[in-house]
Structures are given as structure tokens and as C-alpha cells.
């Protein structure tokens, strides 16, 4: 057999297998009225007389019935004994009493009855016991809404569901009782009834007064309707005049919008041109062309480092390019200040820039002193770049490059002296930030053969600082000239 809910196979309790015929007949007979009540076609109740002996056996077994075979409680609610098919065997089970009498338990009776039945009917079919059990389960199914048989677990789940339904029904009953009690408590008294009747009569009087007021208002409405007709006619005339006004106003607004669009366009062009002019006036072509800054220990011009350290070796092409930019800066500033170098002709050519030095021979060195003035000056080319093949510290290997850097310092000194003479006349003389004396600038030699790496790098940094000073002076001269021209 299988459980009718979870379809799992069942093992029947031993009490069902050994159920005696008397108890079986009593159970079937007690269930017959319920079965007939559930039938769709009503049948007249059939009288089923019970044998007095069977009745006495049933009463005796019921009095001696012990506890159920399976008994489980859920919380504080005990299980109802009528909700489990297992409890059907309680009518046949009894606790054994300690006695010396021979056993008279239902098991012995069932065995005797079973053996007698088998002896009387030796040809009875083997499935008769199963038919009796199926009949018993059909009776149980007819008495309830649940199909039997069911297992213990499903029975527990069924009992839990019924307990929940019982709790819900109990809460609903309590709620209905509470509402009924409140309704009875809120029943109006005689005084309340009198008060309500008085309020009703007052409301009737107010209603009559309101009806009189309504009649007056209706008469006023009639007169207002006549006045409204006249006002509507006047409104139509005003609508025509308003339409004419808006047509003329829209034409004027269209012309005004065209004029404003043209004005905004002209204003936008003027604003853009003004901003561009102001930007150009504030711009400094010298600072934009020659950006002198620093990168750690190195001075830079346009991002090119000028100097070299043992722990940070700078490539010689970068150094040569930096010298080329610095020489171009001096030439540009000299042209702006209208100054011509004395005895030098700088030729900026990028990484291969050079300085031409003119040496005029002294009169004592010439055999003919009277003709010394006609002798052309001697021309020396100073290369302001190095290939980097020669190591630092060897004086004779860097002589040409050293002479070129000394010549560069001389150009800076001459230009600084010229600026000093010009500004001295205005009362605020300007001088180079560092003093230049031969191959030294600020007591640091610029020659590679004499100075170490850090000394030469420092001398290059001081040189670019002086160049930045000259560049700033040229920018001020340009700004002053522009401001004076605009005034």
C-alpha cells in the first residue's frame, strides 16, 4: 500500500493486521451514517443490529485501552485522537496487567478467532485480510476530507495544517465577538436619540431657508444671464480688435527679432576680436620663444638641459642644441635693443652654432706701424658645440669648446653693460644678476677642463639666468613701446 499524499510505500501497523472481526464490524457500523450522509443519492438508513456479545467485547476493550502506539504533541496543543488512522487500533490494544492468570489480551483473542476462521473456512482467499483493511480505509476516507491510508509524516503535516486552521478560525471568532460587543456597547441611548431628532428638525428648518435663498438666487441668475448676453456681444467686438492688435504686434516682433539677431552677431564678433586683441597684447613673443626654466640641478631652455653630471649624464646633442638656442636668444635681444657686438659675430645654427671673433693686430706687432690700420682683423671661428668623444677634465682636448663658451660669456657681458648704460640714464640702472669676468661667472669657471661636472653645470645655470634677465628687459622695452604707442 502507498500513502495517498506522498505516494511512498507504507508498512501497516500490527494492530491492523490482527484486528478481530468484532472490532472491525463495530468500526464499520459506526461509520455507516457518515457514509450515507456523503452519498449523492439519499438512501433510507438501514438498521444494522449489533450482537450483544460483540457490544460487550467492544465495551470491555474500550475500558482497558492503553495509550496509542504513536503519540506526538505539537507544542502546547495535544493531538486529537480522532485525527489519525493509527489510533483506530486503540480499541484493540491494552496494557498487560501483571497477574498470574493466563493471558487474555486482544492478541490472543485475535489469534484464536483467526485460527477458528481458518479452520472453518480453509478455502478462504489470501486477499480477504487485505480487502478488510481496504474496506476500513474506505470507511475512514468517507468520514473525512482526506484519502486514507497516509503515513505518519503526512499525518503530522495534516494535523499541523488543521491546527493552523483552528487558530485562524478562533481568531476570527474572537474578532466577530469583539465587534458584536462593541456594536452593542455603542448603541445610542434615549438622550442621544432625542438629540439626533432635534438636530434633524433643525436641519429641516435650515433646508427650508436654503430653498428660499435658492429662489432668490435663481431670479438673480436670470437677470445676470441677460446681462451676460450683452457682455458676450461686447466680448466678440473686443476679440476682433485684439486679433488685429496681435497681428500688428507679431509683425513688429519679427522685425525686432531680425534686428536683435544682427546686433547679437555683431556684438559676438566684436567680443571675440576684443579678446583676441587683448590676448595678443598680453602675449610676449620672447617668453614664448625662449622658455628658460630648470630641471633639478640643470638649467633648461625650451626643455633642453644645459649641463652634465656624472650621475645624470646628458647627451651631447641636447647640450649642443641648448647652446644654439641660448646664442639665438642673445642675437634676438641684441637686435631688439639695436646693439652690435664689439669684436664678435655670433652665428646661431642650432646644434652647430659658432661665434666668430675678430682680433685686430696691435701696431707693435706690425713692421710698418703707419700701415697697421689698413691690415684686416684676424678672424677666429669658435665652435659652440662638442662631439662628446673627449672625456671631461682634460684641458687641452676641450680648448676649442672652452674658448667658444668664454666668447659666449663675453657676449652676455657686453649686452649686460649696454643695458646698464641705457637704464642708468633713467635713474634705475639694471645690472646682470651675476658678475662676468673672463671665463668666470659668479666665481665659477665655465671651462670644462678646469671645472668639474657640478661646477660646469652650475656655471651653465648662472649663464642662462643672465640670459633670462636680458630677455625680461627686452620684453619690458617692447611692452613700454606698445603702451606708449597706444596712448
UniProtKB/Swiss-Prot annotation:
<dbReference type="GO" id="GO:0000045">
    <property type="term" value="P:autophagosome assembly"/>
</dbReference>
<feature type="region of interest" description="Required for membrane-association, autophagic function during starvation and normal autophagosome morphology">
    <location>
        <begin position="456"/>
        <end position="481"/>
    </location>
</feature>
<comment type="similarity">
    <text>Belongs to the beclin family.</text>
</comment>
<dbReference type="GO" id="GO:0030674">
    <property type="term" value="F:protein-macromolecule adaptor activity"/>
</dbReference>
<dbReference type="GO" id="GO:0010008">
    <property type="term" value="C:endosome membrane"/>
</dbReference>
<dbReference type="GO" id="GO:0045324">
    <property type="term" value="P:late endosome to vacuole transport"/>
</dbReference>
<keyword id="KW-0926">Vacuole</keyword>
<keyword id="KW-0472">Membrane</keyword>
<dbReference type="GO" id="GO:0006995">
    <property type="term" value="P:cellular response to nitrogen starvation"/>
</dbReference>
<feature type="region of interest" description="BARA">
    <location>
        <begin position="283"/>
        <end position="480"/>
    </location>
</feature>
<dbReference type="GO" id="GO:0005774">
    <property type="term" value="C:vacuolar membrane"/>
</dbReference>
<dbReference type="InterPro" id="IPR038274">
    <property type="entry name" value="Atg6/Beclin_C_sf"/>
</dbReference>
<dbReference type="Pfam" id="PF04111">
    <property type="entry name" value="APG6"/>
</dbReference>
<feature type="compositionally biased region" description="Basic and acidic residues">
    <location>
        <begin position="52"/>
        <end position="62"/>
    </location>
</feature>
<dbReference type="InterPro" id="IPR041691">
    <property type="entry name" value="Atg6/beclin_CC"/>
</dbReference>
<dbReference type="GO" id="GO:0015031">
    <property type="term" value="P:protein transport"/>
</dbReference>
<dbReference type="GO" id="GO:0043548">
    <property type="term" value="F:phosphatidylinositol 3-kinase binding"/>
</dbReference>
<feature type="coiled-coil region">
    <location>
        <begin position="152"/>
        <end position="282"/>
    </location>
</feature>
<dbReference type="GO" id="GO:0034271">
    <property type="term" value="C:phosphatidylinositol 3-kinase complex, class III, type I"/>
</dbReference>
<keyword id="KW-0813">Transport</keyword>
<comment type="function">
    <text>Required for cytoplasm to vacuole transport (Cvt), autophagy, nucleophagy, and mitophagy, as a part of the autophagy-specific VPS34 PI3-kinase complex I. This complex is essential to recruit the ATG8-phosphatidylinositol conjugate and the ATG12-ATG5 conjugate to the pre-autophagosomal structure. Also involved in endosome-to-Golgi retrograde transport as part of the VPS34 PI3-kinase complex II. Autophagy is required for proper vegetative growth, asexual/sexual reproduction, and full virulence.</text>
</comment>
<dbReference type="GO" id="GO:0000423">
    <property type="term" value="P:mitophagy"/>
</dbReference>
<dbReference type="GO" id="GO:0034272">
    <property type="term" value="C:phosphatidylinositol 3-kinase complex, class III, type II"/>
</dbReference>
<keyword id="KW-0175">Coiled coil</keyword>
<comment type="subunit">
    <text>Component of the autophagy-specific VPS34 PI3-kinase complex I; and of the VPS34 PI3-kinase complex II.</text>
</comment>
<dbReference type="InterPro" id="IPR007243">
    <property type="entry name" value="Atg6/Beclin"/>
</dbReference>
<dbReference type="InterPro" id="IPR040455">
    <property type="entry name" value="Atg6_BARA"/>
</dbReference>
<dbReference type="Pfam" id="PF17675">
    <property type="entry name" value="APG6_N"/>
</dbReference>
<keyword id="KW-0072">Autophagy</keyword>
<feature type="region of interest" description="Disordered">
    <location>
        <begin position="33"/>
        <end position="129"/>
    </location>
</feature>
<keyword id="KW-0653">Protein transport</keyword>
<protein>
    <recommendedName>
        <fullName>Vacuolar protein sorting-associated protein 30</fullName>
    </recommendedName>
</protein>
<keyword id="KW-0967">Endosome</keyword>
<dbReference type="GO" id="GO:0034045">
    <property type="term" value="C:phagophore assembly site membrane"/>
</dbReference>
<feature type="compositionally biased region" description="Polar residues">
    <location>
        <begin position="81"/>
        <end position="94"/>
    </location>
</feature>
